[in-house]
Curated annotation (Swiss-Prot):
<dbReference type="GO" id="GO:0106271">
    <property type="term" value="F:D-arabinose 1-dehydrogenase (NADP+) activity"/>
</dbReference>
<comment type="function">
    <text>Catalyzes the oxidation of D-arabinose, L-xylose, L-fucose and L-galactose in the presence of NADP(+).</text>
</comment>
<dbReference type="GO" id="GO:0045290">
    <property type="term" value="F:D-arabinose 1-dehydrogenase [NAD(P)+] activity"/>
</dbReference>
<dbReference type="GO" id="GO:0047816">
    <property type="term" value="F:D-arabinose 1-dehydrogenase (NAD+) activity"/>
</dbReference>
<dbReference type="GO" id="GO:0005975">
    <property type="term" value="P:carbohydrate metabolic process"/>
</dbReference>
<feature type="modified residue" description="Phosphothreonine">
    <location>
        <position position="151"/>
    </location>
</feature>
<feature type="site" description="Lowers pKa of active site Tyr">
    <location>
        <position position="100"/>
    </location>
</feature>
<dbReference type="InterPro" id="IPR018170">
    <property type="entry name" value="Aldo/ket_reductase_CS"/>
</dbReference>
<keyword id="KW-0597">Phosphoprotein</keyword>
<dbReference type="InterPro" id="IPR044491">
    <property type="entry name" value="AKR3C1"/>
</dbReference>
<protein>
    <recommendedName>
        <fullName>D-arabinose dehydrogenase [NAD(P)+] heavy chain</fullName>
        <ecNumber>1.1.1.117</ecNumber>
    </recommendedName>
</protein>
<comment type="similarity">
    <text>Belongs to the aldo/keto reductase family.</text>
</comment>
<feature type="active site" description="Proton donor">
    <location>
        <position position="71"/>
    </location>
</feature>
<feature type="binding site">
    <location>
        <begin position="241"/>
        <end position="295"/>
    </location>
    <ligand>
        <name>NADP(+)</name>
    </ligand>
</feature>
<dbReference type="GO" id="GO:0004032">
    <property type="term" value="F:aldose reductase (NADPH) activity"/>
</dbReference>
<dbReference type="GO" id="GO:0005829">
    <property type="term" value="C:cytosol"/>
</dbReference>
<keyword id="KW-0520">NAD</keyword>
């Protein structure tokens, strides 16, 4: 088992039956990040429900909220934070807020960040990520986010990529903001959906190593090679879609059910603990206040149990988030999940 697991053991052994909301990791620049966060990539028809979900999460002990320019949930996240700050429930310095730069603004990171800060009603974010290593063409749309088509496609339905785009330009602009001693809008920078190949180029050509690589990972997609690479380079993984996207299919995995019963926790708790136990940040998404507040029990999985879960995923891999625009990236197909590998 990797030493990332061992380092996590040192944390939890010093705590008596810890809640997952009480566990923190350190980024490679020294900033502390809560191991558990609330994801807010919510369905468009339920965007407004994000506000109550965020309030419920913070009241339950969550201190990490993950959002993005592209989610259109930033205003609702901001409203929730504003109300909780005003009533004294929380202090800004106790929160960790992550947002992201979408590929349509690949060469306008400053604009993206400012729009996110305005929507959130904040002076800074704790972590700014490059959402995808992609560059989209800018197509105007008065009804779109910031007057742009979020993911432009041509008449045949193919994604329109910027002809002159280089995904590293986005990261270099993040880097410039982060390195400016007079710019205090971000405390850390990182990436999302980067493969080993893309990370290798970034590390070679850029000055600041990403603190985080946010990717889809769970027992159906353990990402072991990527996990090892990131650990070797002091980059933390953040797991999105830990339950397996819509319908939470990973809760149906027999081994998950078995281990949840053994540790007397919910399936949600088990899947969250699976990540934290391996030194991975995890950001489950939910709009259900009861589920949010009840999914904070830590299951101290053994190394053998972690290995068993990872072996299952190596044998039956399923990537649930595989959008058409990602088809040009390594390890993506753009064709959606391979449901034949779902094993219940």
């Amino acid at each position: 088992m990797s030493s990332s697991v061992a380092s996590t053991e040192n944390i939890v052994e010093n705590m008596l039956h810890p809640k997952t909301t009480e566990i923190y990791f350190s980024l490679n620049n020294g900033v502390r990040i809560p191991a558990l966060g609330l994801g807010t990539a919510n369905p468009h028809e339920k965007l407004a429900e994000t506000k109550q979900a965020v309030k419920a999460a913070i009241k339950a002990g969550y201190r990490h909220i993950d959002t993005a320019w592209a989610y259109e949930t930033e205003p609702f996240v901001g409203e929730a934070i504003k109300e909780l700050l005003e009533d004294g429930s929380i202090k800004r310095e106790d929160l960790f807020i992550t947002t992201k730069v979408w590929p349509v603004l690949w060469d306008e990171v400053d604009r993206s960040l400012n729009e996110s800060l305005k929507a959130l009603g904040l002076e800074y974010v704790d972590l700014l990520l490059q959402h995808w290593p992609l560059c989209f063409e800018k197509i105007k749309d008065p009804k779109g986010i910031s007057g742009l088509v979020k993911t432009p496609v041509d008449d045949s339905g193919k994604t329109m990529y910027a002809a002159d785009g280089d995904y590293l330009e986005t990261y270099k602009q993040l880097e410039k903001i982060y390195l400016d001693p007079n710019d205090h809008r971000v405390r850390a920078i990182g990436v999302s959906n980067f493969s080993i190949e893309y990370l290798e180029r970034l590390i070679k050509e850029c000055r600041v190593k990403p603190t985080v690589n946010q990717v889809e990972t769970h027992p159906h997609l353990p990402q072991m090679e990527l996990r090892k690479f990131c650990f070797m380079h002091d980059i933390l993984l953040t797991a999105y879609s830990p339950l397996g996207s819509h319908g939470a299919p990973n809760l149906k995995i027999p081994l998950v059910k078995k281990l949840a019963e053994k540790y007397n926790v919910t399936g949600n708790d088990l899947l969250i603990s699976y990540h934290i136990r391996q030194g991975t940040i995890v950001i489950p998404r939910s709009l259900n206040p009861v589920r949010i507040s009840s999914s904070i029990e830590f299951a101290s999985l053994t190394k053998d149990e972690l290995q068993e879960l990872n072996d299952f995923g190596e044998k039956y891999p399923v990537r649930f988030i595989d959008e058409p625009f990602a088809a040009i990236l390594p390890e993506f197909t753009g064709n959606g999940p391979n449901l034949d590998n779902l094993k219940y």
